[in-house]
């Protein structure tokens, strides 16, 4: 669930092939189904990214298409995320191995975000790419991470329009700067953390976590130094964190998937 323009909350419907908005003021829901020509019993809408211009980006993971909904008109634009990738035409089927390979073996989207210009960015966890869709032209561009098959996932955009993401297979945090179209990567100090999300706070530090440990990591990109925080509860399976920049000090909220709890971290420095 992600907040959008006008205070609306946007909810991907996962295997229900669509997205839903909720207006807290009226307590009303509205649902937009996927376009029928791109929908089947394997359709998965797992992520959503509201843009500053009021449109909403969300990927259909099975068809490898990115939708852009305009709630005012109800129009949905469709953008192939991997235009040159057609495994079904080669007789290879559409099932892609969702695991580490020494070489990239296909494409699978795992994370989407919108920048200040309403462009969409997405993570290609299987192909090791960061993708961008130009909001004005619809052009799709893939940028390969420096580490081969790094496993990027759960992307976010900072105040400078830089993209931050976990590199799950490379055990690193990655950043893509659209101004230079260059990457930077920072290796986590503890093996097998498997960074999942990555989000920057108002001080410039970047927070990440991995579902294979119970560690929350804070990165100072200026020095490359990490600080690790061990959660008091073990076997939490961390897949999502969020940074609250409205408080002082800032707060980091952590979803403990296996334990059904939410943790809050307030750094003292």
Regions found by a protein language model. Give the residues of each.
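Short loop/turn segments that connect beta-strands within beta-propeller blades
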Residues: 23-27, 70-74, 134-138, 177-181, ...
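Conserved beta-strand positions in repeat-built beta-propeller and related beta-rich domains
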Residues: 4, 9-15, 56-62, 105, ...
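A generic tandem-repeat structural signature
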Residues: 14, 27, 34, 41-71
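Ankyrin-repeat and related helical/solenoid repeat scaffolds used for protein-protein interactions
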Residues: 186, 201-252
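Beta-propeller fold detector
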Residues: 30-36, 77-84, 88-91, 141-145, ...
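Beta-rich, blade/repeat-based domains predominating
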Residues: 1-6, 37-53, 85-117, 147-162, ...
């Amino acid at each position: 669930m992600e907040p959008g323009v006008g205070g609306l909350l946007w909810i991907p419907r996962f295997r229900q092939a669509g997205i839903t908005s909720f207006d807290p003021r009226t307590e009303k829901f509205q649902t937009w189904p996927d376009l029928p020509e791109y929908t089947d019993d394997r359709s998965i809408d797992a992520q959503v990214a509201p843009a500053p211009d009021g449109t909403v980006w969300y990927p259909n993971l099975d068809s490898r298409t990115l939708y852009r909904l305009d709630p005012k008109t109800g129009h949905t634009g469709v953008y192939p995320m991997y235009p040159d990738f057609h495994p079904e035409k080669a007789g290879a089927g559409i099932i892609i191995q969702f695991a580490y390979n020494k070489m990239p073996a296909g494409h699978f989207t795992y994370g989407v975000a919108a920048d200040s210009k309403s462009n969409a960015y997405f993570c290609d966890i299987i192909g090791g790419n960061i993708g961008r869709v130009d909001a004005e032209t619809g052009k799709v561009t893939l940028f390969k991470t420096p580490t081969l098959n790094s496993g990027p996932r759960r992307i976010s955009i900072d105040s400078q329009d830089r993209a931050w993401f976990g590199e799950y297979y490379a055990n690193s945090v990655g950043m893509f700067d659209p101004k230079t179209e260059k990457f930077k990567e920072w290796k986590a100090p503890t093996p097998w953390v498997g960074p999942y999300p990555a989000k920057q706070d108002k001080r410039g530090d970047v927070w990440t976590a991995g579902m294979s440990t119970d560690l929350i990591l804070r990165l100072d990109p200026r020095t490359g130094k990490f600080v690790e925080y061990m959660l008091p509860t073990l076997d939490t399976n961390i897949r999502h964190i969020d940074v609250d920049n409205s408080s002082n000090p800032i707060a980091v909220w952590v979803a403990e998937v296996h334990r059904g709890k939410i943790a809050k971290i307030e750094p003292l420095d």
